[in-house]
């Protein structure tokens, strides 16, 4: 839903690339009538978002996409635009569309040998009837994995035995809280008592839809365990994430929420703390941005001025990364730091990290949500928005991964710099021959700030996200991925990081 300066063998293919395909396929005709028609279509189809690129879908798909677009306009109840003829609009997009959108086969992509192997260790697991794992977090202090299940709404903790001994690990996980289709849980110390608490975004439904069933809840930790969830705000749409943040510098902790919604609902929200106790705050819900589609929020000082900023990613038709620079006292300046080339690029997630370790925080993002069109797309994958300082940004495309939903960064190969790992989810991968799609890849950073792509696993494109951690205590960063599509399996899978020489002994 977000070219970049290329870092792999095909630098021109990337979400921020500008290609000849952006030219009107109809305007190449010589008639004045065709030029007028093209201009009319482009005004109409590019009014609410970027003008769609005809090459992003095959010819056969454009009738459905065009009719959907017209229906969106009708549902919006707008009457200020002149509608072009629907059949002519379909012909316009089909004229520039390929018969097929081709994606390179994973097993035919050239890549150098990987210095690492990630080996699945099935001793680490917490079996679930229907995982639908929305988030996994590793807690080094307790040697635990916290994970949320969006289908049943549970937030659970799975603990490893002492000294990383998997023989002491419990096969069962401990229930922390149950919400209404819990998505992400942000660990924090809300009341500053030294115990971990969780701010939880609740979707309110498992299927997509426009409704007011979503919530934001707070789970407080104590010496005896976790208290029942307290609802901070209800009657929201589909809340994917809530973050603690003193938005207005008044000393009270507020909440920023990514309320994704669907088509007619959703917003970037602020729960402003109006007082009360830390355990029972009085919150006022304020809409900061009425647009639907925020996929997440992160908070950091990205311009180095000592004030906290916050970054919001938008999916749906917007496909942007938008940074709100903090100016103090609840004032912010918004800037779009990355804008994907087309409404179909499917921004899925992002993280703030100093990827090049130059002292300035960067952004690594994935685009690859395939749950709308169920199409493999060659422009899905991982990108880097590099912070050059003084609020200037450089965009780089790291590489392809169909269905890329999330990434994590760590020094995977132990050479002192940060590498990137990402997972993909594509439900139709199971219908293709083996070797068609990668499901997990990592990008090895080289001294010249380039990245070399390596495949970790193929075909099992069922993962919603990932994180890195030294799970077995050997000093190497391992990989934890969370399961979404397959029933009656572990909610997560742990891949241990091994040098090639060791793993082949």
Q: Can you describe what each PLM-predicted range is?
A:
Residues 14-16, 23-505:
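Beta-propeller-forming repeat regions
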């Amino acid at each position: 839903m977000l070219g970049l300066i290329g870092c792999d063998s095909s630098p021109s293919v990337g979400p921020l690339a500008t290609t000849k395909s952006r030219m009107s396929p109809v305007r190449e005709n010589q008639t004045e009538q065709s030029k007028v028609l093209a201009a009319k279509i482009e005004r109409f189809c590019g009014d609410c978002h970027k003008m769609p690129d005809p090459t992003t879908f095959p010819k056969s798909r454009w009738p459905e996409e065009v009719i959907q677009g017209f229906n969106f306009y009708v549902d919006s109840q707008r009457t200020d635009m002149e509608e072009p003829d629907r059949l002519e609009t379909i012909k316009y997009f089909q004229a520039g569309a390929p018969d097929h959108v081709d994606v390179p086969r994973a097993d035919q992509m050239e890549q150098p040998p990987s210095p690492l192997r990630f080996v699945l260790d099935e001793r680490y697991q917490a079996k679930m009837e229907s995982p639908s794992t929305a988030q996994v977090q590793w807690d080094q202090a307790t040697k635990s994995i916290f994970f949320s299940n969006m289908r049943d709404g549970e937030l659970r903790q799975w603990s490893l035995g002492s000294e990383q001994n998997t023989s002491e690990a419990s096969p069962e996980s401990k229930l922390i809280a149950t919400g209404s289709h819990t998505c992400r849980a942000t660990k924090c110390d809300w009341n500053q008592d030294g115990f971990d608490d969780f701010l939880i975004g609740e979707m309110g439904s498992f299927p997509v839809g426009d409704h007011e069933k979503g919530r934001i809840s707070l789970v407080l930790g104590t010496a005896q365990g976790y208290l029942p969830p307290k609802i901070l705000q209800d009657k929201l749409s589909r809340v994917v994430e809530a973050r603690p943040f003193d938005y207005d510098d008044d000393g009270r902790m507020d909440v920023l929420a990514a309320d994704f919604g669907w088509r007619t609902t959703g917003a970037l929200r602020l729960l402003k703390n109006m007082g009360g106790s830390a355990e029972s705050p009085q919150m006022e819900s304020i809409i900061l941005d009425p647009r639907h589609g925020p996929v997440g929020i992160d908070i950091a000082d990205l311009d180095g001025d000592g004030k906290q900023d916050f970054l919001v990613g938008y999916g749906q038709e917007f496909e942007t990364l938008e940074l709100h620079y903090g100016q103090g006292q609840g004032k912010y300046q918004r800037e779009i730091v990355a804008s994907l080339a087309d409404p179909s690029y499917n921004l899925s997630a992002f993280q703030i990290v100093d990827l090049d370790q130059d002292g300035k925080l960067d952004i690594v993002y994935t685009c690859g949500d395939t749950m709308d069109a169920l199409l493999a797309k060659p422009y899905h994958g991982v990108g880097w928005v590099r912070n050059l300082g003084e609020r200037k940004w450089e965009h780089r495309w790291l590489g392809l991964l169909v269905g890329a939903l999330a990434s994590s960064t760590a020094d995977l190969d132990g050479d002192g710099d940060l590498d990137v790992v990402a997972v993909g989810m594509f439900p139709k991968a199971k219908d293709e021959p083996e070797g068609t799609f990668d499901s997990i890849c990592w990008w090895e950073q080289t001294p010249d700030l380039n990245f070399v792509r390596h495949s970790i696993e193929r075909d099992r494109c069922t993962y919603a996200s990932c994180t890195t951690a030294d799970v077995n205590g050997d000093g190497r960063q391992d990989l934890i991925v969370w399961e979404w599509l397959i029933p009656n399996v572990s909610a997560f899978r742990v891949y241990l990081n091994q040098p090639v020489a060791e793993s082949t002994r």
